Amino acid sequence: MRAPAAMGGAAVGALLGLLAMRPAMASSWASVLTRARGQHVYFDAWGGSERFNAYIAWVSRQVAACCDVTLREVPLEDTAQAVTQVIAEKAAGQNHAGTIDLIWINGPNFAALKRRGLLYGPFAQRLPNDRLVRRSDREIRYDFTVPVDGYESPWRTAQLVFVYDSAYVKHVPLDIRAFPAWARRHPGRFTFPQVQNFLGVAFLEQALYALAPDPAVLQRPVTSAAFAQATAPLWAWFAELRPYLWRHGREYPASGPAERQLLEDGEIDLMPSFDPASAAAAVLAGRLPKSVRTVVLRGGTLGNASFVAIPYNAAHKAGAMVVANFLLSPAAQARAGELRALGGPTVLDLKALTAAQRALFQAQVHDPWMPPPAALRHVLPEPNPSWAVRLAAAWERRYTP
């Protein structure tokens, strides 16, 4: 391990949690740190964000300095690739030397691995910085209605927002029911990603919350009867909206970045995003004009937490725990909250921090391209993962040529 004098403030902070721990827990964590030294942690994560990749590069430098852990990001196009890999290794009897140590995961992918018993843990409560997490938030205790139970550790939150260019449109719909009328007045100026992409399904699920006769049914595993009743108003609503979408609703962008490119190119004026800071970051990078604004629908929008999980057969579990713990450190969370990094709210309970730690967050500046913090406080829980699967399948049957 490098000498403490060579550590940055963030790296030192990753170790200070030991001071506040009970002796037995401190001894256990010290053992984790010892085993982690020299380990190479392979972190499978969606690699479609330059901001995320840059942030993980910063995290890599910090855990190398504080704990002699080498973090290697393995970029994925879809987290399902990691799930498939772990399942394949289980089938092949590769139970002790898996190729994945840590996964950025949530929702259906977490549910799939947890259901099969393919996750290591529970481990989250063993992390010193876990005591700082804002456990009062439902989206941190439940992942798409599935109890987390310590098998994954949160590191950031996200919420569905809508981004528009105020230079071209002054008023945007703040209620799902108003989208068809708005689209009729602005034909071709709104779209959302295809439903094979999580953002496309999220937009439809947001509409379901507003239109279903009983939104509470979305918190339970889907049944054929419940699906038919809940989605009947959705299909009627979409029939009104579709003709006025970009390219008449016959084509959809493949992903969030592809959708944003349409906004950059002036092909659309309004789009959904699951990252409240994405527009602000794009403005600062010179990719979107300063006239861009971000809004949240009245009554709240879907929100969730991003987690990291450790496969049952990870070869470097101790190193993976060190990385997960560092992601929860006040220094790492404050860095993630900066627009030059990721932006967005922390998963920490600020009341659990010291005055010096809270100051890291209070120094953050609110930009006009982000929604006001108060608008992000009303978070709707994600539906049970089975709804997304059924919704995507029904969509493809109805609208795929």
Regions found by a protein language model. Name each.
Residues 46-58, 74-81, 96, 100-257:
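Extracytoplasmic ligand-binding site segments that recognize negatively charged/polar headgroups
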Residues 110-112, 270-289:
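A ligand-binding cleft/hinge motif common to bilobed small-molecule-binding domains
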Residues 301, 306-375:
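Mature extracytoplasmic/periplasmic domains
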Residues 21-23:
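N-terminal signal peptide c-region/cleavage motif recognized by signal peptidases
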Residues 144, 158, 238-241, 276, ...:
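Periplasmic-binding protein-like
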Residues 261, 368-401:
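Conserved C-terminal helix/tail region of periplasmic/extracytoplasmic solute-binding proteins
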Residues 86, 113, 259-264, 310:
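Hydrophobic residues within well-ordered alpha-helices
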Residues 29-37, 44-70, 162:
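Short, polar/charged alpha-helical segment
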